[in-house]
Amino acid sequence: MELKLKSISPSSIGAAIAKAERYRFLNEPEEAESICRDILAVDPLHQMAQRILGLSITDQFTGGAKDRFNEAAEIFTALEEEYARSYYTGILHERHAKAQLRAGRPAQAISAELEEAMHHFENAERLRGRANDEAILRWNRCARLLETIPRPQSMEENVFESEEIPSHPSHHATAARVGRHH
């Protein structure tokens, strides 16, 4: 049996958007994604449906190779408003970083992803309307999350912090200069 998807009527798009948002809030992103695809089949440029579709895809991120990062990126970069493109691309990178963090990925990859998100949020902040602090709130969250991720120490710090350095008179002088005594 061949299955052919049925089309919704253009007059029901508003109710369908509300239903897609509700499914996202119920943590059922696959349902929201399906509804958005039905809306976009009728109105391919519907901005709210595109936003919810992209967010629904990011809701499904697990930090694995099967995450549909590129698909969500294409959706967000196709948004009409420059502010929306920057803001939602920032969310894409932030959510990707959080999924990688939950999956135990290396700190360097997570840090780079959060920094990319912050770059997009800074751009959105410059483009924002009056009384719209969404981008600032997201930037601050990324900054706080970055503070919790261990940073690799520089080579110089590793030398001075290592307890395995053999005792040598010049070592004691160096340790004294940096404020560390044995």
Which residues does each predicted region cover?
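TPR-adjacent "capping" and linker segments in tetratricopeptide-repeat scaffold/adaptor proteins
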Residues: 1-15, 76-77, 108
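Repeat-mediated protein-protein interaction surfaces in helical alpha-solenoids
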Residues: 1-7, 30-36, 66-74
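Terminal, low-structured helical/coil segments at or just beyond the last alpha-helical repeat
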Residues: 2-4, 126, 131-182
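Amphipathic alpha-helical repeat scaffolds of TPR domains
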Residues: 10-15, 43-57, 80-103, 133-145
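Alpha-helical segment of the N-proximal tetratricopeptide repeat
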Residues: 11-35, 99, 103-104
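N-terminal interaction modules that seed assembly of large macromolecular complexes
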Residues: 25-61
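Structural marker of alpha-solenoid helical repeat scaffolds
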Residues: 42, 75-79, 127
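Short coil/linker segments at helix-helix boundaries
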Residues: 57-78, 88-123, 148-162
